[in-house]
């Protein structure tokens, strides 16, 4: 196959990609959920909608180390099996090189991203060697001011040198400042696997050293995971199964979620169970309703009715629905009396006794843009039909994000359908095939990270031991600051060392320019990763990790369904000088004098065998017979049956049947429509009952300078920022820029046409994006999909992120003092035509390098 450079590929495909992005910005129903082409030898083809791109995989300039030997490869030629967040794949290897990926034969909906997965080992952005920032190599921590600068040069060093430098920085930090100076509780989706998962590998090392400052919650779901334990006793309650929904639900409401897109991935790996259920729901003809400022890919596929409130105004719509049902005497008083606490307090707010404002549909119309008549009819429709509300997480990654889920729980309580087959709500139907019935598979553990220190801790702890997950910028910039958090006071420590592995905060954290300033504060930043993300470019020491194709591992199948186990078999040699995460941290442990404690004398295969055998023993205790490890490894996977009891699971059914015998883990044992505990915190941004708060930035706060509101939806072509450095992105970008979806009315007012390169600007930063004019986004709102790599460059217009990372624009403030979750869709912006030459995207190239 001929060599194809990234620039050549972009040039050749720019027109095609732009046309595709413009013509069909959400054509998921054609691409993700239908079956235009069957794949020979693929038995599930008629039931799944696999697409197998015809275009060849681009080849990068591949320079291998002398240790690479095709004779050593397990698969010089052939097929294997491994797993990624996008699913189980069978890599096809020719001449020691992956040339493609075949889907797993039991996958209901193979990912559209198989091409990008296959290309990942050869990405132009691959971290090829251990690298150290030149200024750091010369001046150490004194060089922090230039960390992350666009023209900062890097030096290739040996593994031994890189590990020595990293070990010295770690040792010095613990010796001089103690574990409270170590920000090691990284966040990110890393690679799947029970052994070479970067986060537990790093946590194990740092805990053996004495500990580190931890984090609570996730960027995905911090608000709901904090508020829902107060409301229903669990941050992520198990959902009623899809089997029950299909059988018993008369209406399904997709509120702020897009399961066709977001179920493409799984925290472990997936066989995409959700797809079969969506097909069955559509085939049955159940009416679905999508409540979202964007007409989602799911709504397109299902033919859903589309109700489109302004971003962040969903609690107002829900409150107005409650008002309407109360005013027409349609509330379920018996349910409220028996199963909830605090209806009287909430009702005072709804009817205006608390603040003098009645939460009528007319009130909500002025806020949300949804006509009052539609709010009324919607309220009565869901009251008159058994309705399952499927609420997403994007709706809580917005200012005051706790309120949407809490208000929906209140609405469902007023309807009285919680605990009934096909009724109530679920918070994870959009994630990891949530709602799939649990199999009988036992749990499989991973490399233990909660281990005791093996060296003395000589410095006293300063500050709090656990921080909110999204406090990283604030904490780095303001050591010693005291904040309110979930009823407690938290004090930021002073960080001297930041270690990040398998994650990219320069995409998932809001106000990216401010994060870049914060990353200049620590003495040392160490990053372990596969590719040159912006996070790696803001480090001092960078250690190259392997992709899942380049090592052995094992993992569960299905976070929600626990379908079974899959062997992750090495398909190719580690490329360049990359190493498996476990080997990297074992080598670091060796330099720190704690290798035996870290490895326990086990090789990678020893650990993998242990994980399986421990699960096998657990299965035996549960009456599940599993084959021995060698038999399992040879076959490559193991799937478990699902019982009828699990297939017919109804959320909160036990609680409804007997609330005294099965109380919720809340203050009252019931659903909390009012929480005395939260009220007792006296927060002005999260009261004792669900409330509508106007977002700090949104449609209601439009100004002449920034008249539009931003939404940052998930992209079907990557997972957060993963795969953005492969050719997959070219299927959804315009001249290598992230598309900006804009309503025809807003585009016309600005003289913008399809495919134009535009400047999108907020109070915090500016990005370049390619215009996609579509009526699938409401007027006054734009969409820039989340996950484009941060690529700031100096231009005549100032510093511009020329690739188009949505978080460059977003406000960095907590959702509230309760959850302190991150925002992703809170920003006022303006979109204008870019004038002059378009700056080149450079973030997928190797960084500037000094040859020594």
Where are these regions (language model features)?
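N-terminal export/assembly segments and adjacent metallocofactor-ligating motifs
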Residues: 2-330, 371, 748, 792-852
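N-terminal leader/propeptide and maturation segments of large enzyme subunits in energy/redox metabolism
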Residues: 136-161, 330-370, 456, 571-660, ...
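Extended redox/cofactor-interaction regions of prokaryotic respiratory oxidoreductases
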Residues: 197-280, 284-291, 315-319, 413-537, ...
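Flexible glycine/proline-rich, aromatic-decorated loop/lid segments
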Residues: 297, 533-567
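Short beta-alpha connecting loops at secondary-structure transitions
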Residues: 303-308, 563-574
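Active-site phosphate/pyrophosphate-binding segments
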Residues: 321, 342-471
